[in-house]
C-alpha cells in the first residue's frame, strides 16, 4: 500500500508520524512547490492521500480510497476529481488552542491591553491609571458573548468564558442543547435576534452555503456600536467589503481577524489577507491564521492522522469522516 503526502504541511506531518505507520506502507512525500514531474506516478499509485488540497487539474488518482486532510476544512479538496466512494476525513485537535485565542483577544480588547502597553512603553504615560484618576478600561465580566457556530470550537469558547461571568448565547445550524453556563442556542436563521444583544461576537462556524457571507452589511448594522467581533471561522463567513467599512467607519468598535479572504501562494509568499488595508486600522487585531497553530495542537493532530491511516491499513472504521463521494 502507498500513501502520498502532498504539500508543505503534509510533508511536515509525514516527518512527524512516519515512525508510527505500518512498515508495509510505502510513503511518498511531495513538498511545496509540487513536483509536477513526480506527481502523475505518485497519484496513480496511492491508496491514501494526505493533504489539504486536491484540484481537478491534478493527474488521475484512480486508487485513492482515503483522503486525509491535515486541517479541519476540506474545502480545497475537490472530491469530484477523485474516485467514487472515497472517504474524506479531517483532522481536529485544534479546539482548545483556538478557544484560548478567542478568550485572549477578548480580554486584550476589553482591557485595552495593546493600546495601554504601547502608550506606557513609548511615552511613559500614566493617563489610564488610577494614579491620575484616568479613564478606566473595561472588563469582560457582565458582558454578553454571542457564539456563532456551537460545534467543537464554539463549545470550547463557551466553557472558557463561563468563569468570567459572561452571559453566553450561541447560534447553530443544527439543534443543539446548551451546556451549563450557556443561556440559549438560537437556530442560525434567528441570528438576527442574537446579534443586537451581544457585546462580543465570536464566529466559529464551518464555511458552507448557509454561512458564506453570513455576516453582511445588514447584520453588521444590527450589532451594537461598542461590539467586538472575533473571526476564527473562515474569512468568507464575513462580507469583506462590509466588515472593512464597518471597522473603518467605526460602526462597530473593533475586531480580531485570524482568518482571511486571500492567502499566500508561490507568486506572492507574503500576500496580504485582504484587498483592504485592515492592518492600518488601529481597532483591529490581525493574526495570520495561526490561532490554532500551537505545539500541542500539532501533536494532537499528528496522533489523529497516524491513527486514521493505521485504521485504514487494518481495514477498520475511520474517524473524523466528513464526506464520502
Predicted segments, located by residue:
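Oxidoreductase and adenylate-handling cofactor-binding alpha/beta cores
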Residues: 99-118, 162-166, 303-316
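Rossmann-like dinucleotide-binding domain for NAD(H)/NADP(H)
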Residues: 226, 232-325
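Rossmann-like dinucleotide/phosphate-binding beta-alpha-beta segment
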Residues: 133-225
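Structural alpha-helical scaffold elements that stabilize or flank donor/cofactor-binding regions
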Residues: 39-42, 57-60, 193-197, 219, ...
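Rossmann-fold NAD(P) dinucleotide-binding segment
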Residues: 55-62, 79, 210-229
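N-terminal glycine-/charge-rich "phosphate-binding" loop or analogous flexible N-terminal tail
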Residues: 1-48
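Short glycine-/small-residue-rich Rossmann-like dinucleotide-binding loops
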Residues: 54, 71-72, 199, 205-207, ...
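Phosphate/diphosphate ligand-binding glycine-rich loop within oxidoreductases
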Residues: 44-122, 137-138
Amino acid at each position: 500500500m502507498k500513501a502520498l503526502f502532498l504539500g508543505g504541511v503534509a510533508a511536515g506531518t509525514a516527518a512527524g508520524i512516519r515512525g508510527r505507520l505500518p512498515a508495509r506502507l510505502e510513503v511518498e512525500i511531495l513538498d511545496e512547490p509540487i513536483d509536477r514531474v513526480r506527481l502523475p506516478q505518485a497519484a496513480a499509485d496511492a491508496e491514501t492521500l494526505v493533504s489539504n488540497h486536491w484540484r481537478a487539474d491534478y493527474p488521475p488518482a484512480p486508487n485513492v480510497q482515503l483522503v486525509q486532510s491535515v486541517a479541519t476544512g476540506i474545502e480545497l479538496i475537490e472530491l469530484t476529481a477523485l474516485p467514487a466512494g472515497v472517504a474524506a476525513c479531517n483532522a481536529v485537535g485544534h479546539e482548545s488552542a483556538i478557544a484560548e485565542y478567542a478568550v485572549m483577544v477578548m480580554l486584550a480588547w476589553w482591557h485595552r491591553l495593546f493600546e495601554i502597553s504601547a502608550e506606557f512603553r513609548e511615552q511613559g504615560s500614566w493617563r489610564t491609571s488610577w494614579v491620575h484618576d484616568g479613564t478606566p478600561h473595561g472588563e469582560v465580566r457582565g458582558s454578553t458573548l454571542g457564539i456563532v457556530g456551537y460545534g467543537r470550537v464554539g463549545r470550547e469558547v463557551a466553557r472558557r468564558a463561563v468563569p468570567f461571568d459572561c452571559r453566553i448565547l450561541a447560534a447553530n445550524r443544527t439543534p443543539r442543547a446548551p451546556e451549563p453556563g450557556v443561556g440559549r442556542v438560537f437556530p442560525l436563521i434567528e441570528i438576527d435576534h442574537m446579534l443586537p444583544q451581544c457585546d462580543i461576537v465570536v464566529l466559529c462556524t464551518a464555511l458552507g452555503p448557509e454561512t458564506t457571507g453570513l455576516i453582511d452589511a445588514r447584520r453588521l448594522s444590527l450589532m451594537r456600536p461598542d461590539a467586538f467581533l472575533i473571526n476564527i471561522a473562515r474569512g468568507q463567513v464575513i462580507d469583506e467589503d462590509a466588515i472593512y467599512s464597518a471597522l473603518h467607519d467605526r460602526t462597530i468598535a473593533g475586531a480580531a481577524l485570524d482568518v482571511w479572504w486571500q492567502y499566500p501562494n508561490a507568486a506572492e509568499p507574503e500576500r496580504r489577507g485582504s484587498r483592504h488595508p485592515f492592518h492600518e486600522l488601529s481597532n483591529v487585531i490581525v493574526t495570520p491564521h495561526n490561532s490554532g497553530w500551537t505545539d500541542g495542537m500539532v501533536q494532537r493532530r499528528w496522533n489523529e492522522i497516524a491513527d486514521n491511516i493505521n485504521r485504514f491499513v487494518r481495514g477498520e472504521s475511520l474517524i473524523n469522516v466528513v464526506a464520502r463521494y
